[in-house]
Amino acid sequence: MKRQYAVIGNPIGHSQSPYIHRLFAGQCQQKLEYTAKLVAMNEFRAVADAFFQEGGHGLNVTVPFKQDAFQYAEETTERATAAQAVNTLIRQDNGLITGDNTDGTGLVTDLLGNLNWELKAKRILVMGAGGAVRGILQDLLDQQPQHIVIANRTVEKALQLSRQFAGSGYILGCSLDMLDG
């Protein structure tokens, strides 16, 4: 029997996740079905409930539902709790839905391993203050940059994130208008 997985978001048509996961499953001789699901803005909980009730095993969560997924999870990993955002929901053997956030691990692994970028003592600019940014900040701060600036259209969101992660390093929030060429 194939395990059921999906990526959910809005929009979702651009996602390459189904293609990538099917290729990976084939390489690992795993039997799985991986689909993309467009979810209406107020339907996250209903869609996630139906997916898991119908035997679904795991969901990848993208824009704009990462904070909804954090609220949905019955238990969360340390990094998901720090981010207060979830991009991965998995039904455990005991039935509990666990939320994790792998955004930061993926980004830092790519920057260090594939691009050979050193982040320690560097100045980092992050554009935006949504769920993906929540997921990357702790992993970036763990690399001990000189500082991180979060720039966002809505300055209050950037400031809120800078306060949330202030205990982990030097982090500032500002509006996009405050950036100087």
Region roles according to the model:
Residues 2, 56, 121-122, 145-147, ...:
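A general structural motif
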Residues 2-115:
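Phosphate/diphosphate ligand-binding glycine-rich loop within oxidoreductases
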Residues 9, 101-104, 111, 115-145, ...:
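Glycine-rich adenosine-cofactor-binding loop
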Residues 33-35, 96, 147, 169-172:
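Conserved beta-strand segments of alpha/beta enzyme cores
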Residues 39, 153-154:
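Short beta->alpha hinge that forms the Motif I/post-I loop of the SAM-binding pocket
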Residues 156-164:
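Short alpha-helix adjacent to the SAM-binding motif of class I
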Residues 167-181:
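Short acidic low-complexity segments
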